[in-house]
Amino acid sequence: MGGIVRCILADLVSRQTINQLRLEAADCKRCDLWKTGTQTVFGEGKQTSTVMLVGEQPGDKEDLAGRPFVGPAGALLDKALDEAGIDRARVYVTNVVKHFKWEPRGKRRIHKKPNAIEIAACMPWLQSEIDAVKPRAIICLGSTAAQAIISPKFKVTIQRGQFVKSPLAQFVTATVHPSSILRAPTDEARHMEMRRFIDDLTKIRKAIE
């Protein structure tokens, strides 16, 4: 019984760590994106998650909700995880950049890619999340995440699905960001890209089983 209690207490301490990080990040002003973002969008998921998914930055829906991957790309991601046989409860989701970078276009807020300064300013938060969660696998979603975590020279279009050696986790790889699937020009193209995306996720699931 004592061992069980110690495990529970250790898990509670770990949870407090991520909660503290979230509270600290809420007031982050390391770059200027806080001036136009509604709020900091920190990572979400259990401390015991075995898989960490890292995207580029929150989108419009995420910025308003204060939670990552709750918009259309998040819905597509949830579907792909389910089809790949990955339990969503075992996944921690976050982004390299914690504020929504955008430009106005009419009444809409359109995504803008974060620059190197903004990415560098946010990297300590991501590193802290990785240290707290200690995932077995990290999946970078899109080129921004892959180049920030794996290598500035990483090409998702060429190297997607390949495992790379990293001190961050036992398994580290990259695939496309789900938003890129939504932007595919035809239904057929979307179907094909979705299938490839699911295949990439399935490969991770088989590796960590």
Predicted regions: what is each one?
Residues G2-E209:
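A polyanion-binding, active-site-adjacent surface
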